Amino acid sequence: MVNSIFYIIMGPPGSGKGTQSQRLANHLGLPHISSGDLFRSAIKSATPLGSKAAEYINKGLLVPDNLVWEIVQETLNKPGCKSGCIIDGFPRTLDQAVLLNDFLVKSNAADYRVIQLDVSAEEIISRIHSRFICPACNYVYNQSQGFKECPTCHVALIRRSDDSLEVIHQRLESYEKATVPVINYYEDLGKLIHIPSETSPDEVFQSILACTEA
């Protein structure tokens, strides 16, 4: 990979990293790799790895590193990612971060950057508990928007099984425990950029663009 562009978008559940990752991918003309979407696709296809991952995701727990890396690496090795990509939802543990760093360095993509979306726990709980998704296109809607079906796909919106209050708290606890070492790792490497993310999605995106274009 020559002159490839890789951005890793990190943040707690409900921080908007999926939305911002897709917007950045569209802006830069790069693929958007969402580990969550990869897992859900594997689960829907009932692959052996997908079935194992489902047991963890539905309980709000982190998927073991060996399952995560095998799924993500397979996608990163595809021709479409040769010029770079936007990675969302990975890595979530220090071991995953080291594996990804080694992979990117060997792929001549050592000049990657990590964007951390900072959001308070109170805001996260409010966001997640009021969100619904389209099962066809995975677009996320807020309850305050008043939609009962996706305006694009005309499919009824649903709440993900891992968006219940109990599971939200479990996910936040799991995220905090596993991800702090990842943040410290990227800070030590000089890769980390903090973006305050409790403003509007448009304002957050402008802050991200300012960092990527600096």
From Swiss-Prot:
Q: Which Gene3D superfamilies match?
A: P-loop containing nucleotide triphosphate hydrolases (3.40.50.300)
Tell me which EC number(s) this protein carries: 2.7.4.3
Query: Could you say which residues bind ATP here?
Result: 14-19, 131, 140-141, 199
Instruction: Supply the alphabetized keyword list.
Output: ATP-binding, Cytoplasm, Kinase, Metal-binding, Nucleotide biosynthesis, Nucleotide-binding, Transferase, Zinc
Instruction: Spell out the InterPro entries in the cross-references.
Output: Adenyl_kin_sub (IPR006259), Adenylat/UMP-CMP_kin (IPR000850), Adenylat_kinase_CS (IPR033690), P-loop_NTPase (IPR027417)
GO CC annotation? cytoplasm
Region listing for NMP, in residue ranges: 34-63
Q: Which GO terms describe its biological process?
A: AMP salvage
Metabolic or biological pathway, per its Swiss-Prot or TrEMBL entry: Purine metabolism; AMP biosynthesis via salvage pathway; AMP from ADP: step 1/1
LID: annotated span: 130-163
Q: Name one GO molecular function term.
A: ATP binding
Q: Which residues bind Zn(2+)?
A: 134, 137, 150, 153
* Ligand binding (AMP): 35, 40, 61-63, 89-92, 96, 160, 171
User: Known PANTHER family for this protein?
Assistant: NUCLEOTIDE KINASE
Could you describe the subunit structure of this protein?
Monomer.
| Biological function | Catalyzes the reversible transfer of the terminal phosphate group between ATP and AMP. Plays an important role in cellular energy homeostasis and in adenine nucleotide metabolism.
The record's section on HAMAP family has:
Adenylate_kinase_Adk
Its family?
Answer: Belongs to the adenylate kinase family.
Domain free text: Consists of three domains, a large central CORE domain and two small peripheral domains, NMPbind and LID, which undergo movements during catalysis. The LID domain closes over the site of phosphoryl transfer upon ATP binding. Assembling and dissambling the active center during each catalytic cycle provides an effective means to prevent ATP hydrolysis. Some bacteria have evolved a zinc-coordinating structure that stabilizes the LID domain.
* Annotated protein name in UniProt: Adenylate kinase
Q: Please report the organism this UniProt entry assigns to the protein.
A: Chlamydia caviae (strain ATCC VR-813 / DSM 19441 / 03DC25 / GPIC) (Chlamydophila caviae)
